């Protein structure tokens, strides 16, 4: 009936973190996802380039900071939305691994282009032409991020099927919690790399405070 609830008995066997990791590592498709997630972690550093552009450039030069946040944030969201709508159908017809590699490149190159674009027009990024160019760049980056998210979920679902085929059980919870583990691990690695990079160039400690104080006092990248 409508008010009847199906009760599924919980599994008697419980696994700790060590056992769960062994299950994940022993599954070849998921192991490949784990390794690729670690290898992709430096891409997250490129996100800081975008945030630097928004916070230090548009946030300090122009009074319409929220307008630019809406424009570029909308570009990222739009790119993600379109990619997430298209990728499931494309994944049915094309090799998922190649699509994952392509999406990684698609997400990395646009963010990497932000600094060269700044060098081309350091004083004119508020002009319609450059705003349009950056809109396209952010949209492509958002598309790459959205495609990666969908493909990772699809490929982890395939890993669950693989485990069921070879071991006779479906560790859905283990593998999809592993997806969160991959994301957190990648973020941690990228943060370490980013911190080391900032230390090498001297952008840490008192220098960060000095930079922020200078910006608050009216300094701008246009004067460089």
Regions found by a protein language model. Give the residues of each.
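Membrane-embedded alpha-helical bundles of multi-pass transporters/translocases
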Residues: 1-224
């Amino acid at each position: 009936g409508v008010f009847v609830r199906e009760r599924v008995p919980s599994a008697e066997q419980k696994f700790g973190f060590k056992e769960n990791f062994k299950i994940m590592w022993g599954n070849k498709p998921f192991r490949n996802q784990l390794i690729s997630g670690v290898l992709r972690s430096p891409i997250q550093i490129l996100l800081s380039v975008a945030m630097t552009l928004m916070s230090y450039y548009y946030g300090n030069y122009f009074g319409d900071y929220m307008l630019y946040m809406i424009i570029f944030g909308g570009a990222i969201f739009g790119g993600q939305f379109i990619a997430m709508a298209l990728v499931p159908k494309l994944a049915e017809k094309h090799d998922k691994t190649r699509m994952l590699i392509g999406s990684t490149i698609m997400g990395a190159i646009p963010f990497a282009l932000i600094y060269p674009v700044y060098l081309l027009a350091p004083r004119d990024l508020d002009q319609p032409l450059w705003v349009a160019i950056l809109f396209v760049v952010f949209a492509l980056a958002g598309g790459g991020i959205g495609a990666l998210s969908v493909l990772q979920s699809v490929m982890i679902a395939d890993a669950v099927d693989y485990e069921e085929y070879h071991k006779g059980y479906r560790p859905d919870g283990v593998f999809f919690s592993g997806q969160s583990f991959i994301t957190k691990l990648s973020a941690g690695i990228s943060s370490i790399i980013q911190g080391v990079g900032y230390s090498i160039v001297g952008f840490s400690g008192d220098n960060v405070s000095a930079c922020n104080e200078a910006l608050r006092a009216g300094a701008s990248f246009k004067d460089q």
